[in-house]
Regions:
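Short, solvent-exposed loop/turn segments at secondary-structure junctions
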Residues: 40-44, 63-65, 101, 130-133, ...
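Short amphipathic alpha-helices and their capping/turn segments at secondary-structure boundaries
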Residues: 26, 112-116
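A short SAM/SAH-binding and catalytic strip from SAM-dependent methyltransferases
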Residues: 94-105
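Conserved N-terminal segment of class I S-adenosyl-L-methionine
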Residues: 1-90, 94, 228-231
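Helix-to-beta-strand junctions that scaffold the AdoMet/dcAdoMet cofactor pocket
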Residues: 104-105, 118-120
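Short glycine-/acidic-enriched loop or helix-start segments at secondary-structure transitions
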Residues: 45-47, 69, 106-107, 135-137
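S-adenosyl-L-methionine-dependent methyltransferase catalytic module, highlighting the catalytic core
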Residues: 108-109, 113, 123-236
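Aromatic-acidic/polar surface patches that form glycan- and anion
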Residues: 7, 11-15, 103, 168-173, ...
Length: 239
């Protein structure tokens, strides 16, 4: 039985809550070896936390330049988990990603490759944005220059540390039985699948933001999977 939940975006672990979320997950499950996919310039756990946990913690990106922005104290691995001829020698108790899954161009290949680098009983944990929340529909279908302008208006950030990458949203949806079946067909057990309603992109427009908050509160009580804005999923390798 899959644990499916729906929550408000304020509980989404994919941003500032992620370090504590992953820290607690590692401790709770006796994790010893970890790799963060798509960490690039912004690894989730700081080096001192990694040392206190006593774990091996590698960070990954397919872009050498992005990895070069992070401290050399990290174990760095360059590979593309979407590659059809993927090979990576090491295996891990935990593979996780933060706001990277929406940028995966071929989700089936990605999740198959991640499955291959998990130890038996190991976990894959992902936090990601989903369709069909309006901001992400626009992000997917608008030309890059226009979506860049909108991002700078509604959610400005330091591009040297948080670059904007193309989003595909392949398998990036809220909880639904079709998607759960796809993960199970690859050999995963879906431990938990949570959808989150709401987003921060209307904060500069108070009335619109208030309406979004009202809508999100209603959707938590009456969930519609395809209207989630974000998702988190915990998968386990069981075969």
């Amino acid at each position: 039985m899959v644990d499916v939940q729906y929550k408000n975006v304020s509980e989404f672990p994919g941003w500032s809550k992620m370090p504590q979320f992953i820290h607690d997950f590692i401790q709770r499950n006796g994790i010893k070896t970890v790799i963060e996919i798509g960490a690039g310039a912004n690894p989730t756990l700081p080096i001192d936390t990694i040392n206190k946990l006593g774990i091996s913690y590698a960070i990954n990106d397919f872009d050498v330049h992005e990895l070069s922005k992070s401290s050399d104290a990290y174990i760095k691995t360059v590979f593309d988990p979407c590659s059809s001829n993927f090979y990576h020698a090491n295996t891990y108790d935990l593979v996780f990603s933060r706001m990277a899954l929406e940028h995966v161009s071929n989700a089936k290949t990605f999740h198959k490759n991640i499955f291959g680098i998990l130890n038996p009983g190991g976990y894959a944990v992902h936090c990601f944005s989903t369709l069909y929340a309006l901001p992400f529909v626009l992000n997917k279908f608008l030309p890059g220059p226009i979506s860049n302008i909108l991002l700078d208006i509604f959610n400005p950030r330091d591009r040297s540390r948080h670059e904007k990458f193309r989003a595909y949203y392949d398998w990036a949806r809220g909880p639904n039985h079709i998607l759960i079946g796809k993960f199970e067909a690859l050999g995963y057990k879906v431990v938990n699948f949570t959808g989150y309603f709401g987003h921060p992109y209307y904060k500069k427009i108070p009335l619109l933001n208030k309406l979004e908050e009202i809508k999100s509160a209603w959707l938590v009580r009456h969930p519609i999977s395809y209207l989630t804005s974000y998702g988190s999923i915990i998968l386990q390798k069981v075969r």
